[in-house]
Regions:
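A shared catalytic/ligand-binding motif for oxyanion handling
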Residues: 1-203
Length: 203
């Protein structure tokens, strides 16, 4: 099964839908997870039809912030388990194996991290079996995942590191561009980080 995850930072522009369509054409995923759609249900229904997906679970944006969507093709056996403003969780039956797939958006603001990550941990700990998470975690695991800016360690809790360590999960790695986010000014003053990834428990 091929799965595509993307922090689209708003899906209301035709150019963004075209860019997503190009990615889908190249990767040919059966499942797509979008975060920060900044869109309501009717807009996501239109996007789903444009991209030729058959079913979806949508968490609407609040005003012009947030918004999640998981879309899948006909023939993919998916049952929605749970959803909130930070995650969509589904059970996937794939070749006689049932596993949990979670599309996750980790809030960048410290005041909102504890609740979002607490919900994620509770969901994973209640599931008996295999699981995988994809999305924008808004954390780096080590200094090699950042280029530029202050690379000093933070005393704040890194929930992604806790997830990898406490639940014996693994980072699924990447191909292509190492960094998925660029902030600050362009050029030497810019900061690049790997915030988007896939994480799974494989045994």
């Amino acid at each position: 099964m091929r799965i595509l995850g993307w922090n689209c930072r708003g899906i209301c522009n035709a150019s963004t839908v075209q860019a997503l369509g190009a990615q889908i054409k190249g990767a040919r995923p059966e499942v797509v997870f979008l975060s920060k759609t900044k869109a309501k249900l009717n807009r996501m229904e239109s996007v789903k039809k444009t991209l030729k997906f058959d079913d979806s679970c949508v968490v609407e944006a609040k005003g012009h912030a947030g918004g999640l969507c998981l879309m899948w093709k006909f023939g993919v056996d998916i049952k929605v388990v749970e959803y909130n403003k930070n995650l969509i969780a589904v059970k996937v039956s794939d070749q006689c194996v049932e596993w949990l797939l979670v599309g996750f958006y980790g809030p960048p603001y410290h005041s909102k991290k504890k609740k979002a990550w607490g919900d994620l941990f509770a969901l994973l700990e209640s599931h008996q079996g295999l699981w995988a998470i994809m999305g924008d975690f808004n954390y780096i695991v080590n200094e090699e995942e950042q280029l530029g800016g202050n690379r000093g360690g933070s005393l704040a809790t890194n929930y992604l590191k806790e997830l990898l360590f406490e639940l014996n999960a693994v980072d699924l790695g990447y191909s292509g561009n190492k960094y998925t986010w660029v902030g600050g000014k362009w050029g030497k003053a810019s900061i690049k980080r790997r915030l988007d990834r896939g994480v799974a428990i494989i045994s």
